[in-house]
């Protein structure tokens, strides 16, 4: 008869602690790149939509991750991740 595998792996941090730590890190990074009034408006929108729930925490984490990714990708001056056209000495371009 089949049995569920025993939990032999290392103990994981509880999801809610991990989510709150991640949210704190994202907030700290977001205030370096976006106006506080925008972030406050986003927080108000999430609160008005989801209230004080884990669904709201997950939503704001997802939105902040997307905003920061796009911000870095389009060329944040604080980051090396952005798209920066590279100069070629011979003018050749890769396709």
Swiss-Prot record:
Residues 1-42 are annotated as: Homooligomerization. GO terms for cellular component: host cell; host cell nucleus; host extracellular space; virion component. The modification Phosphoserine is found at residues 79, 93, 95. Keywords: Activator, AIDS, Apoptosis, Cell cycle, Host G2/M cell cycle arrest by virus, Host nucleus, Host-virus interaction, Ion channel, Ion transport, Modulation of host cell cycle by virus, Phosphoprotein, Transcription, Transcription regulation, Transport, Viral penetration into host nucleus, Virion, Virus entry into host cell. It comes from the Viruses. It holds the Pfam family VPR. Its main location: virion. It is found in: Virion; Host nucleus; Host extracellular space. Phosphorylated on several residues by host. These phosphorylations regulate VPR activity for the nuclear import of the HIV-1 pre-integration complex. One of its GO terms (biological process) is regulation of DNA-templated transcription. Homooligomer, may form homodimer. Interacts with p6-gag region of the Pr55 Gag precursor protein through a (Leu-X-X)4 motif near the C-terminus of the P6gag protein. Interacts with host UNG. May interact with host RAD23A/HHR23A. Interacts with host VPRBP/DCAF1, leading to hijack the CUL4A-RBX1-DDB1-DCAF1/VPRBP complex, mediating ubiquitination of host proteins such as TERT and ZGPAT and arrest of the cell cycle in G2 phase. During virus replication, may deplete host UNG protein, and incude G2-M cell cycle arrest. Acts by targeting specific host proteins for degradation by the 26S proteasome, through association with the cellular CUL4A-DDB1 E3 ligase complex by direct interaction with host VPRPB/DCAF-1. Cell cycle arrest reportedly occurs within hours of infection and is not blocked by antiviral agents, suggesting that it is initiated by the VPR carried into the virion. Additionally, VPR induces apoptosis in a cell cycle dependent manner suggesting that these two effects are mechanistically linked. HIV-1 lineages are divided in three main groups, M (for Major), O (for Outlier), and N (for New, or Non-M, Non-O). The vast majority of strains found worldwide belong to the group M. Group O seems to be endemic to and largely confined to Cameroon and neighboring countries in West Central Africa, where these viruses represent a small minority of HIV-1 strains. The group N is represented by a limited number of isolates from Cameroonian persons. The group M is further subdivided in 9 clades or subtypes (A to D, F to H, J and K). Belongs to the HIV-1 VPR protein family. This is Protein Vpr. It comes from Human immunodeficiency virus type 1 group N (isolate YBF106).
